[in-house]
Structure formats: C-alpha cells, structure tokens
Curated annotation (Swiss-Prot):
Gene3D superfamilies: Ribonuclease Z/Hydroxyacylglutathione hydrolase-like. This is Hydroxyacylglutathione hydrolase. PANTHER family: HYDROXYACYLGLUTATHIONE HYDROLASE (PTHR43705), HYDROXYACYLGLUTATHIONE HYDROLASE GLOB (PTHR43705:SF1). Zn(2+) 1 binds at residues 54, 56, 113, 137. Thiolesterase that catalyzes the hydrolysis of S-D-lactoyl-glutathione to form glutathione and D-lactic acid. Its cofactor is Zn(2+). It comes from Gloeothece citriformis (strain PCC 7424) (Cyanothece sp. (strain PCC 7424)). SUPFAM superfamilies: Metallo-hydrolase/oxidoreductase (SSF56281). Monomer. Binds 2 Zn(2+) ions per subunit. Signal peptide: none annotated. One of its GO terms (biological process) is methylglyoxal catabolic process to D-lactate via S-lactoyl-glutathione. Keywords: Hydrolase, Metal-binding, Zinc.
C-alpha cells in the first residue's frame, strides 16, 4: 500500500492510499476533489473507498463530487456520524475492521474533537516497518484537536487508546499545524530537550516548504504535551495531579494561545 499526501485548502492534508497490484485507491478525509482527481489520473487508478474520520466540512467536502466521478465507491464513517457525512453507507464502531486491497485495518472510536470521531489503524504487514494511523483531528503533530463536541475525559480516553499503539506507528494527521503546536508545547515544557530539538528541526523544515506529516508516535510521546498529560512535568505545569483536569487546563491554554 502506497500513501500519497495531498495538500488541500489552506492547511489540510488528504491521504490517498494506492494498491498498485489492483490499481485501486482509497482516500482519507477528502477536503476538496481536485487534488484527489489529479493524483488518480496520474496513477490511472479507480477510487473505490472514502474513509472519513468525522463530519467536518474540511474532511468531507469532496465526498459528493468524488461519488459523481466514481459512483460505485463506498463511503465509510463513524456510526454516530449517521446523517452527517455525505454519501455514507458503512457505519463503523470501536473494534470494527475495514479492508483496502490486501490490508486490514482496525477502527478506533475516539470522541473528543467531535462526538463521533473515529480513527483507522493499519498495522505493519510483511516487510513493512511501520503501522499507519489515520487519526483526522484527534492527534496532530505536536498537538491535538479542539474539543468542539467532546469533553476532556473523552479525549483523554481516546488519546490513551492511540498512545498505546507501537512507537513506530506513523501519524497521518489532517492538518499542518506542527510549528505552532510546538511553539505552544515549549511554553509548557521549556526544558524538554527532545521538544527543543524537534522544534528546531520543524522550523527548518517549514522554512523550506517541507511537510511535517506524517510523524512517528514515539516522537509524539516525547514531545507532544497532549500525549504527556500524565507526566509529572505537565502535571506540575498545569498545577494539578488529576489527569482529566490537567488535560482540560492544557487544552484551554492552547485554545487561547
């Protein structure tokens, strides 16, 4: 399975999965149709699947247009997003499996950013060294999504599930927010050497127009404050020992950063 990162809108990423043997493709969270159609044309591939993580317009905006071009494709989304995702036919819940070509993925129910958010995890297969996590707006490189419909307790539970995946899991998040996320993280953990080094690397990468997605879960666990709510450094910075309260305060600070 090959993965293509397609920039869209101002800071979105659409991910196109390609099975070269069958010459079929799937897209994750298509914000707009043009990047997808251009990539499909270059590959000469047929789009058979849309995997949506949640209902927001910058994640489902191209669904209708892509269905018009490929009327036999299937749209997947969360069970609790019923009626909110255009063209949705498959309604997924925690522990369900999805198939793309010869790859089988697991569905995680990860409410927080929205009440119905899901993520798709494809574990390593064969000689591949990394698993692939398509997490929408749940984890960002260096951050996490705002809590529009969910609670801090829900998000802590959701991130706990994803944090338990192997460190070599690639994090395919849907926005290029990394530099600003790490600027905020440094206000919380200014003495974190791993974070300092990552910020320097990302600053250079972005100045040269390079993407910072995907990242690796192992790096996120060392540098992303929203995966470190239960470390003493973050607890001390937030003035609490209660994980949910710590996370809520952390998210509140980021909302106003």
């Amino acid at each position: 399975m090959k993965i293509f990162r397609l920039p869209a809108l101002s800071d979105n990423y659409i991910f196109l999965l390609h099975d070269p043997q069958r010459n079929i493709a799937a897209v994750v969270d298509p914000a707009e149709p043009e990047p997808v159609l251009t990539c499909l044309k270059k590959l000469g591939a047929e789009l058979v699947t849309i995997f949506n993580t949640h209902h927001h317009g910058d994640h489902v905006g191209a669904n209708r247009a892509l269905i018009e071009h490929f009327p036999n494709l299937t749209v997947y989304g969360g069970e609790e997003d019923r009626g909110r995702i255009p063209g949705q036919e498959v309604f997924l819940k925690e522990g369900d499996r999805v198939q793309f070509g010869d790859r089988s993925g697991e569905v995680f129910f990860v409410p927080g950013h929205t009440r119905a958010h899901i993520a798709y995890y494809f574990p390593p297969q064969g000689e591949e060294e990394t698993g692939e996590l398509f997490c929408g707006d749940t984890i960002f490189a260096g951050g996490c999504g705002r809590l529009f419909e969910g609670t801090p307790a829900q998000m802590v539970n959701s991130l706990s599930k994803l944090r338990a995946l192997p460190d070599n899991t690639r994090i395919w998040c849907a926005h290029e927010y990394t530099l600003n996320n790490l600027k905020f993280a440094l206000t919380v953990e200014p003495e974190n050497i791993d974070l300092q080094n990552r910020f320097s690397d990302v600053k250079i990468a972005r100045s040269e127009g390079e993407a910072t997605v995907p990242s690796l879960l192992g790096i996120e666990k060392l540098t992303n404050p929203f995966l470190r709510w239960d470390t003493q450094a973050i607890k001390s910075a937030m003035g609490s020992q209660d994980s949910v309260q710590v996370f809520g305060r952390l998210r509140g600070k980021k909302d106003n950063f």
